[in-house]
Amino acid sequence: LLLFINLLCFVFVSKGQNLVLNPSFEDTIACSVFQNNNYPQMPCTGWYWASGGSCDYFSEQYLCISSPAPYNGWGWQYPKTGVAYCGFALFTNFSPQFNNYREYLGGQLIDTLKQGHTYCVSFYVVNADSGKYYTSNIGMYLSPDSSVDYSTALNLPYTPQIVNTNGIIYDTLNWTQISGNYVAGGGG
């Protein structure tokens, strides 16, 4: 009873520039650093858990993890580009302890967004083979700070500015692009 969506990258485009730090998740930290201090940091530079739920990292080359790509423990999936991707559970309901459990992935930008400027934002998702739920309700929340809450693995109170308009995403083979325009407000 696990919905598992694999996330490829957040792409912020302003005049063709990608403002995401490590958008394909391929720059990694040393195995010893990750294995000794992995909460809430992901093994890929610039990415982190944005809640108490633990996102997953899959790579064809990073051997510090037990679930390399393309077989990832939840099914089988090649990365959209490169050799790595991240995955997270949007909803699980498999026991009373994990009722409404959610995972959120956070990422860093290489520069501050300029107030009043419009940015094209896109990312790609695909369902895990083992997923038993599907969703149309997936999006991205942009914030001038890290917007994390490690005290909970439940639904966070943020309204995403970029939302899926493709309907329910059933595909377990092909990556689906989710995109939209974002006008940066004050503070970033």
What does each model-identified segment do?
Residues 17-118, 122-128, 133-143, 150-188:
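Aromatic (Trp/Tyr/Phe) and Gly/Pro-enriched flexible surface segments
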Residues 1-20:
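Bacterial Sec-dependent N-terminal signal peptides
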